[in-house]
């Protein structure tokens, strides 16, 4: 549902931020 989509989006953003930090 919408919660899952939001969670996935946040996960992608988090991974992008972590990748940039590394």
From Swiss-Prot:
Skin. Has very strong antimicrobial activity against Gram-positive bacterium S.aureus, Gram-negative bacterium E.coli and yeast C.albicans. Has strong hemolytic activity against human red blood cells. Keywords: Amidation, Amphibian defense peptide, Antibiotic, Antimicrobial, Cytolysis, Fungicide, Hemolysis, Secreted. It comes from Xenopus tropicalis. GO terms for cellular component: extracellular region. Belongs to the gastrin/cholecystokinin family. The keyword Secreted applies. This is Antimicrobial peptide 5. The modification Leucine amide is found at residue 22. It is found in: Secreted. GO terms for biological process: defense response to fungus; defense response to Gram-negative bacterium; defense response to Gram-positive bacterium; hemolysis in another organism.
């Amino acid at each position: 549902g919408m919660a899952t989509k939001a969670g996935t989006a946040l996960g992608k953003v988090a991974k992008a931020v972590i990748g940039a930090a590394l």
